[in-house]
Amino acid sequence: MTSNELKEIMRKQGRADALDLAARAPQMDGTAIIAEEEKIPAWSENAVYTSKQVGYPVQDNGQVYTIQMPHTPAHNPGSRPADLRAIYSLLHTTDPAKAKPWMPSYGTSGLYKLNEVCTYPNAQGVEHVWRNLWNDNEFPPLTLNVESRWEDLGEAAAYGL
């Protein structure tokens, strides 16, 4: 088998894995989707996301999102999923080893549910993993007067992040 044939087999398997996850994603939560992150395709500015792809996951800049409505990213040049949160819903996980950097919510997109985790620098500037203790939390760890909404799980490096 040539290297080109092997690449083609791997490409087909990757596509099949991505389509399988996409079909299951609407019934899955962020933790389950992010657990299969290696199957999630990268967001593309050149894509055309149709109504058939609503609910499909995409990843961009280290975050995972689901597509909320049909659209063509090229119509918003220079914008990425983090900028278009009415179109892309930010997902979170409860798995500390898969924690993503904290991002602000946009409406209900990206609110942290109970036990979801993120990475965020501690008071000394060292990246830590934090578990959310408050449902629908929009505040980052260490925010004045809401510190009790987060539990520090330790350095992110201890989780391989």
PLM segments and residue spans:
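Tryptophan-rich substrate-binding surfaces of secreted polymer-degrading and adhesive proteins
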Residues: T2-L161
